[in-house]
């Protein structure tokens, strides 16, 4: 299963790179369909293990799939995962195509987790008296934030603000894949052993224009590691991690200004919360910031996103 997972990851990365700037996905249809079936069967094995434990308790399945293309300006997004096939295999109702449905209804297709984050903020406040504003920062491939200014169970816009704010793990992971045999920088140890090239970092930040208003969803194709070309593995990892941290920090400052509070709490989920160097770099951009892993509050930060899609599926 571990081998199969790695094989699928490589296939996903390959097709994603191939269609990165495509205007039409139809010419890749056969390749996409074949890979989609493989991914669905792989998911079925995992889902089936859960069903074996409590099949009668499962009413439906929320199936997101693997994103390989996202172009909200064209109202096109593609996640690999066949909901109909998964439904046939599990004999359960499967809710899927979350992002395409959002695009067709006037949304950006991302982020979609804020409704769940908002409900989670209320539960965390009840249990731990954390208070508001409360911000949930998800550092996945892309970083997004949900700011619950004041809890409202209807999720009214003036009480909650959410947006993509920058890269998360995508650039760091890409650098590691292309320059080493590792798929990611565990705990940021490679970056920590390197030295940031300040000149290259500042030039990259000056040239980056995707963060002007935080009103559109972001995709990996909005970012590039080209600026670090020629650096050593360690120095490149450090420079790219600090670049990522600065963009995330810019987004956090935007949220601070939006909710008129510099003292709001930040709870971090997603794989990026395990990158200690990244979190330290984010903190270094603030005089004082309350930034903690969501795991400190009896939750598992690896599963917030998957729980969000179960929540959305029920709704």
Give the residues covered by each predicted segment.
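Active-site neighborhood for divalent-cation/phosphate handling
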Residues: 62-125
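A contiguous, well-structured pocket-lining segment that forms one wall/lid of small-molecule binding clefts
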Residues: 181-264, 275-289
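Glycine-rich phosphate-binding loop of actin/hexokinase-like ATP-binding domains
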Residues: 118, 122-190
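Short glycine-rich phosphate-binding loop at a beta-alpha junction
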Residues: 56-64, 260-272
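Glycine-rich phosphate-binding/hydrolytic loop that grips phosphoryl groups
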Residues: 242, 292-315
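Short glycine/proline- and acidic residue-enriched helix-loop micro-motifs
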Residues: 21-35, 183-188, 230-231
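Short beta-strand-loop/turn "lid" adjacent to the catalytic site in phosphate-handling enzymes
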Residues: 26-81
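Short, small-residue-biased leader/transition segments that mark boundaries at the very start
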Residues: 2-3
């Amino acid at each position: 299963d571990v081998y199969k997972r790695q094989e699928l990851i490589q296939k996903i990365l390959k097709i994603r790179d191939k269609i990165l700037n495509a205007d039409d996905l139809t010419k890749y249809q056969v390749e996409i369909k074949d890979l989609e079936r493989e991914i669905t069967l792989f998911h079925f094995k995992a889902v089936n293990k859960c069903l074996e434990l409590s099949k009668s308790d499962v009413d439906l399945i929320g199936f997101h799939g693997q994103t390989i293309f996202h172009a909200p300006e064209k109202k096109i997004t593609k996640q690999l995962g066949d909901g109909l096939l998964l439904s046939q295999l599990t004999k359960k109702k499967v809710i899927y195509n979350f992002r395409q449905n959002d695009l067709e209804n006037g949304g950006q297709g991302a982020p979609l987790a804020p409704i769940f984050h908002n409900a989670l903020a209320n539960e965390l406040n009840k249990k731990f008296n954390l208070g508001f504003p409360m911000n949930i920062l998800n550092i996945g491939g892309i970083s997004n934030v949900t700011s619950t200014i004041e809890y409202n169970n209807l999720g009214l816009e003036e009480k909650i603000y959410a947006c993509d704010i920058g890269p998360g793990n995508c650039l760091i992971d890409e650098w590691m894949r292309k320059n080493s045999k590792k798929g990611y920088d565990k705990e940021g140890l490679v970056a920590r052993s390197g030295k940031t090239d300040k000149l290259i970092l500042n030039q990259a930040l000056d040239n980056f224009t995707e963060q002007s208003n935080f009103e559109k969803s972001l995709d990996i194709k909005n970012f590039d590691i080209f600026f670090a070309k020629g650096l050593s593995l360690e120095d490149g990892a450090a420079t790219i991690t600090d670049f990522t941290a600065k963009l995330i920090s810019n987004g956090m400052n935007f949220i601070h200004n939006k909710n008129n509070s510099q003292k709001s709490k930040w709870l971090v989920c997603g794989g990026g919360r395990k990158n200690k160097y990244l979190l330290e770099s984010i903190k270094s951009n603030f005089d004082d910031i309350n930034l903690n892993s969501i795991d400190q509050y009896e939750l598992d930060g690896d599963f917030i996103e998957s729980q969000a899609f179960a929540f959305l599926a029920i709704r």
